[in-house]
Structure formats: structure tokens, C-alpha cells
């Protein structure tokens, strides 16, 4: 293992011991925010420290076995060689494990997120596809034990959505779903197509981390225009008799957020503000990323329509992820929510990219 990596690990052990001591301090115990943050840091460091301790023990075992090679007893030398083989295998395994544990973490990975799906080119067929995508993500979330809560839905007359926004909450939601941002293209024969011609339509997906109140960007109320209106679905379904739906316009950026899912105006306003916070935060993140001008490719899409990440080809039963050149012929399973076969390879590729950048340092 590189000397620089060992030094980094030694520093983390020192910090772990420091955090452990602080968690027993009555002053820290009395400060809920501080105690919560330190507890989180403690749990993040715990695995790294345990892995490094095991690594050091394996190094000691190797050194002891090497000393035994000098023994006169042939049986002892044979035992030493066996122990050396075991220790080297353990060291190799732990080195890989520790490198993964040292990878830079996206601070938002554990956050809940907002999932936004918008119909693009393709008219009614694109809106139907947006509905299919929303159903696919909802099923996937259900399989992970996550909760999906509708924030706003602009339904299409022929089914599906022109736009749908939902909040997804649960363990590590953003860290997994963030790779879904980008352009999704569908190729299939619409039900209304009498000639059997394949149509191509598209949707854009944007995944934004939900920002905790303590980290929220301060928004000047004077920079907001808030309108109320009556909620309604396509063809007048779910019509509310009161003006409970909310539209918030952030004047400096022109961002517009609507929420009409709840019957309470107060709840709709709170949800809309959360979405606005997430979008403003995304703008800041994109600015920061542009300033850093990172040369390393990013697998996390911007939600831009031009950035096509995946194609769903129904006649061939095929799904292709263009970022990692992965094609699978299990479209039926994917649209029913079995996204694991697409999500896992993307996460592995992302991890490999991070490991490569760590070894370059």
C-alpha cells in the first residue's frame, strides 16, 4: 500500500479516537446537533478503522511467518510458508477494501431526493413513456423499501404525464438514483399506429438531492412570487373547490415550481419550497463543478435533454445504457422496476473511476 494512503489511514484512526472521546463529553451530549453530527462521523470512520487494524494485524502475521522461515525444523518452515500465503492474501483483500472505504463520498448520497420526469419530443407517446418511467421508478423504490410521495403531476389527455415530480425517501436514495439523470429515449410502436411503424420519443429525468433545513440556501421572500390556483388533473379529475394549489416563481432565476398534490395550501407551499431549494442548490452545484472544470468523466447526468443516457427498444426487448455501453435484453423486467441490473453496473463503473483517480494522486 502507498505510504500516502497509510498516512491518511493513520490520520483517520487519530480522528476516530478523538470523536470517540468527544461522544462521552457531557457538553457534547447536551448539544443535540453536535452529538448527531459526531455520531454520524463515528459510524463512517468505524469500518475504516476496523479494516486498518485488521490490515496491520495481517502485516504482523506476515512478518512473524517470515521469521519462522529461518527455523531449522522443516515442518515449521512449511507451516511458515502456509501462513505467509494466507497473510499475503489477507493483505491484498484488505488493501482493496480500504481503498474503496477511502473513496471520496458525495455528501448528498444519504439524502432523500426529488425525481422529476418531463415528456420531451414525441407528443402523446412521450407523455405515456413519462408515465411508464414513473411507474418503473415507483416499483423499484418499493423493492428497496423506499417511499414515493407525489409532489406535482401535469397529466396528459391520452395517459401518462407531461411532467411529474415526486419525493423519494429512504436509505441512500440520492446515491443510487442520481445516475438516472439525463435523457431517456423509447422506441416502440404506439397503440394508435395502424401501419406498425416504430416511433421514437424521449423524456428527461432530473434527480435532485433534498436539502436538509439546516443546510438550505436562504431565500429572500421578496424574490418570490406566490400564486394560488385550483388543482385539476387532465379532463378535470381531482378538481379541488378551493385554491389550494401553489405556484412559486423565483424571480432572480425564473424558476417555477408547482405543487397541487395536497388538499392543504400550507402543505403544498412547504413541498414547493423544498423543490425550489433543491433546484437552487443544483444550480450552485453545477456552477461549482464548472469552476472546478474536472476532466474526469461524470456518470451523473445533468438532466439535460441532449444528454441521452439510455434507450428502451420495445420491438427488440432491449435496454442500452450509453454511458457504459451496456445492453441487456430484459426490457420487460426493467420496466416492471427491476433496475438492479442497470443500477449495479453503473455504481461499479463509478467506483472504478474513483479508484483510478485515487491511484493517480
Curated annotation (Swiss-Prot):
The modification N5-methylglutamine is found at residue 237. Peptide chain release factor 1 directs the termination of translation in response to the peptide chain termination codons UAG and UAA. Belongs to the prokaryotic/mitochondrial release factor family. It comes from Alteromonas mediterranea (strain DSM 17117 / CIP 110805 / LMG 28347 / Deep ecotype). Residues 287-306 are annotated as: Disordered. Signal peptide: none annotated. This is Peptide chain release factor 1. Pfam families: PCRF, RF-1.
Amino acid at each position: 500500500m502507498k505510504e500516502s494512503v497509510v498516512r491518511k489511514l493513520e490520520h483517520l484512526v487519530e480522528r476516530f479516537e478523538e470523536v470517540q472521546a468527544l461522544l462521552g463529553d457531557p457538553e457534547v451530549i447536551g448539544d443535540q446537533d453536535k452529538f448527531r453530527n459526531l455520531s454520524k462521523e463515528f459510524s463512517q470512520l468505524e469500518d475504516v478503522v476496523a479494516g486498518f487494524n485488521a490490515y496491520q494485524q495481517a502485516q504482523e502475521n506476515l512478518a512473524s511467518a517470515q521469521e519462522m522461515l529461518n527455523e531449522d525444523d522443516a515442518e515449521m518452515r512449511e507451516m511458515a510458508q502456509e501462513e505467509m500465503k494466507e497473510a499475503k492474501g489477507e493483505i491484498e483483500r484488505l488493501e482493496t477494501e480500504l481503498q474503496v472505504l477511502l473513496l471520496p463520498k458525495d455528501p448528498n448520497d444519504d439524502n432523500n431526493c426529488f425525481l422529476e420526469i418531463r415528456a420531451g419530443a414525441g407528443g402523446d407517446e412521450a407523455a405515456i413513456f413519462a408515465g411508464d418511467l414513473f411507474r418503473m421508478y415507483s416499483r423499484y423504490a418499493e423493492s428497496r423499501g423506499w417511499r414515493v410521495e407525489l409532489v406535482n403531476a401535469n397529466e396528459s389527455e391520452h395517459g401518462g404525464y407531461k411532467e411529474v415530480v415526486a419525493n423519494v425517501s429512504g436509505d441512500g436514495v440520492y446515491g443510487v438514483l442520481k445516475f438516472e439523470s439525463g435523457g431517456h429515449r423509447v422506441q416502440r410502436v404506439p397503440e394508435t399506429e395502424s401501419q406498425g411503424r416504430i416511433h421514437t420519443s424521449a423524456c428527461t429525468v432530473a434527480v435532485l438531492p433534498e436539502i436538509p433545513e439546516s443546510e438550505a440556501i436562504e431565500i429572500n421572500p421578496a424574490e418570490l412570487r406566490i400564486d394560488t390556483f385550483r388543482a385539476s388533473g387532465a379532463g378535470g379529475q381531482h378538481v379541488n373547490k378551493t385554491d389550494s394549489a401553489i405556484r412559486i416563481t423565483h424571480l432572480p432565476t425564473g424558476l417555477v415550481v408547482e405543487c397541487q398534490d395536497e388538499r392543504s395550501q400550507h402543505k403544498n407551499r412547504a413541498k414547493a419550497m423544498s423543490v425550489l431549494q433543491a433546484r437552487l442548490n443544483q444550480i450552485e452545484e453545477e456552477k461549482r463543478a464548472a469552476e472546478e472544470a474536472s476532466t474526469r468523466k461524470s456518470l451523473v447526468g445533468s438532466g439535460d435533454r441532449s444528454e441521452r443516457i439510455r434507450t428502451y427498444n420495445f420491438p427488440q426487448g432491449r435496454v442500452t445504457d450509453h454511458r457504459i455501453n451496456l445492453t441487456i435484453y430484459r426490457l420487460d423486467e426493467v420496466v416492471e422496476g427491476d433496475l438492479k441490473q442497470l443500477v449495479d453496473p453503473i455504481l461499479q463503473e463509478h467506483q472504478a473511476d474513483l479508484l483510478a483517480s485515487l491511484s493517480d494522486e
